[in-house]
């Protein structure tokens, strides 16, 4: 690992963030689902401030990113940190960058008095599952994620 830093994304990073999102979606075989644009990301991240992004750099070159936001746990009674995306370039995996990004987010969660940090992982993604388990993250075996999108969301809103 050369000179390594994790920094907050700036408005100038929007094209990079979108590129990382697309690379992650391609890896997850979900590129066809990405509809985000630079304009949408700019509005969401820097105008509405709905989420935050950190960029991992080695020798000044971007090697990965994490996008996260706060949710709330009624059970814990405190906000949590929800990791939406974590991505490290394939050529830079296994060098500690993913671990450094997770550690950085854990530090943010502790500094902000979050009760927990959570994320989802595709069930076929064994390398990521093994990585998360090696960081002492526990899978939520008894929970299933549900989602409403598109027409289903619009129809539900009408009822």
Residue spans for each PLM region:
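A short helix-loop-beta-strand connector motif used in the catalytic cores of GNAT acetyltransferases and
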Residues: 43-55
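Conserved beta-strand in the GNAT
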Residues: 55, 61-70
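Conserved active-site alpha-helix within GNAT-family acetyltransferase domains
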Residues: 99, 123-142
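Conserved beta-strand-loop-alpha-helix junction that forms the acyl-donor binding cleft
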Residues: 119-128, 147-150
């Amino acid at each position: 690992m050369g000179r390594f830093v994790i920094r907050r994304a700036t408005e100038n990073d929007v094209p990079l963030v979108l590129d990382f999102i697309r690379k992650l979606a391609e890896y997850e075989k979900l590129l066809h689902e990405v509809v985000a644009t630079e304009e949408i990301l700019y509005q969401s991240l820097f105008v509405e401030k709905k989420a935050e992004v950190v960029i991992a750099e080695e020798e000044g070159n971007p090697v990965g990113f994490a996008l996260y936001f706060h949710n709330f746990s009624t059970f814990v009674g405190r906000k949590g940190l929800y990791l939406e995306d974590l991505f490290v370039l394939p050529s830079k995996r296994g060098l500690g960058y993913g671990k450094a990004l997770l550690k950085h987010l854990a530090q943010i969660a502790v500094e902000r008095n979050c009760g927990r940090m959570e994320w989802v992982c595709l069930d076929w993604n064994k390398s990521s599952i093994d990585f998360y388990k090696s960081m002492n993250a526990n899978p939520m075996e008894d929970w299933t994620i549900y989602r409403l999108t598109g027409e289903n969301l619009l129809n539900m809103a009408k009822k």
